[in-house]
Amino acid sequence: GSICLEPKVVGPCKAGIRRFYFDSETGKCTLFLYGGCKGNGNNFETLHACRAICRA
């Protein structure tokens, strides 16, 4: 889906939550630390969920 093409958004908060996003340049789901607020759709709780939705 189109959410997989959205940029990684850490957001302004500082929670440091382990999440995964789809990196459209590499075609892979990658770990990042999410701040906890004001993110976007390219933000998955698990690697499996990221791969399932973005077909990585």
Swiss-Prot record:
Alphabetical list of Gene3D superfamilies matching this protein: Pancreatic trypsin inhibitor Kunitz domain
Record carries keyword Secreted: yes
Domain of life, per lineage: Eukaryota
Xref: SMART domains: KU (SM00131)
One MF term in the entry's GO annotations: serine-type endopeptidase inhibitor activity
One GO cellular component term noted in the UniProt record for this chain: nematocyst
Keywords: Disulfide bond, Nematocyst, Protease inhibitor, Secreted, Serine protease inhibitor
Sites marked Reactive bond for trypsin: 14-15
Domain BPTI/Kunitz inhibitor positions: 4-54
Presence of keyword RNA-binding: no
CDD domains the UniProt entry points to: Kunitz_SHPI
Disulphide bond pairs: 4-54, 13-37, 29-50
Post-translational modification: Contains three disulfide bonds.
UniProt xrefs under Pfam families: Kunitz_BPTI
Compartments in which it is found: Secreted; Nematocyst
Family: Belongs to the venom Kunitz-type family. Sea anemone type 2 potassium channel toxin subfamily.
Extra facts: A synonymy between H.magnifica and R.crispa is controversial.
PANTHER family: BPTI_KUNITZ INHIBITOR DOMAIN-CONTAINING PROTEIN (PTHR10083:SF374), KUNITZ-TYPE PROTEASE INHIBITOR-RELATED (PTHR10083)
Functional summary from the UniProt entry: Serine protease inhibitor.
Protein name per its UniProtKB record: PI-stichotoxin-Hmg3b
Organism listed in the record: Heteractis magnifica (Magnificent sea anemone)
